[in-house]
Structure formats: structure tokens, C-alpha cells
Curated annotation (Swiss-Prot):
Protein name: dTTP/UTP pyrophosphatase
Active site annotation, chain numbering: 83
Taxonomy of the source species: Bacteria, Bacillati, Bacillota, Clostridia, Eubacteriales
Site positions (Important for substrate specificity): 20, 84, 167
Cellular-component GO terms for this entry: cytoplasm
Amino acid sequence: MVTIWLGSGRMLVLASASPRRAMLLEAEGFSFIRVEADVSEVLPQGISPESAVKGLALRKAQAGLNRWLNHGGSREDIILGADTIVVLNQQILGKPRDEEEAEAMLTALSGQTHYVYTGVALVNGAGRQECGAVCTAVFFRSLTHEEILEYIATGEPVDKAGAYGIQGLGGHLVDHYEGSLSNVIGLPMEYVKERLSVWGMGLGDIALHEVKDGLPSVKGST
């Protein structure tokens, strides 16, 4: 049994396997449950970056909602889905499939300005939904081929859009950025907190939930 503290008598459900998104929510004091949200991330040709991340975030949130309801979750619980992409010269860079693709991405990013878009979607089982996107400009310093290979050898680029993680060793590749840092990591927390507040979920009005065998129930409130 896991005890979860959340505001407004509802649960926040993160439809993502990303440890970075979980870390960002935890750092802001939110408690939540995580569910898998496996969706195809194949994008149609010619789609804009903002439309791409908003669409994928919404699909992830809806997949997470279906999974949550199938496990007995409340229709009033809030499901959060997100997706992050890197855009360089109007080309969308996703997660590298292998080290060779990671090398190509990092070589292209070297000495250039790129843009990180994260789409954020909130849905519940009562039919309410919304999605938005946040963009941050990131300026890479010029990298040597040796630096690129050394970074790839750390294994860090494997599961990250654009083949780098600004919160880890990849931070040394960045000269500076303009906008939200948490957006580059995977979840724009300034935006997320504002939208959750609109949905009536904050860190006050606490209710105690128990999750047993995947089935949530309210135990009591303060």
C-alpha cells in the first residue's frame, strides 16, 4: 500500500515513464501516481513543432487516463501527459535511435541555436481536457568531435530528445539558454503549476489517499 498526499481530494496522475518529469514534480512538492502511456510517436510530415508536442502530449494523457480508469481510478483525477522535442533549422529532432544518430544530432547542434518545445496536456474522465506548449531557446557552444564522442560514451544521450540532457553532463555543451530551464529538462513547471491551479489543484486543501492493488480510495482529509 502506498500513501499519497494530494490537494483538492483528487489525485494527480503522471502519464509518463520519464524520471526527469517525475523529479521536477517532486521538487515542487507534488505527489502523484505514475502510469504507462505507450503511444506511437510517429509525426506526420509538415506538422509544426507546437502542434506536434501538443498532439503527442494529449495522446499520452488520454492513454494514461484510459489505463487509470481501467484500474479503478476516479473520473475526477487529473492526468498529466507531456512530450518534448528539439527543433533545429525547422527540423524536429527526437530521441536518437543509436550512437551514430546521437553523434549526427550533436554535430548538427554544435555552435547553433535550437529550440526545445514541450507540450503539456491535462485531462480527466469527466471530459475536461486542455493542452499547451512552451518553447525555450538553447545556445550550444562549438564542440570538438572528441567532446561529442566522449559525451556519447557516457550513455546519457540515449533516451533524450536532441541527444543531450541539460540537467546532467550535457549541461557542459550549452553556452546559455533563454526561457524555462525545466522545459528543457522535460516539463515546464511554471506553466504546469499555473494550469494545475486553474484546475483547482494546489499544495493546500490536503486529502489523504491510499492506493492498494492499483485501486485508489480517499481515506480522510484535514
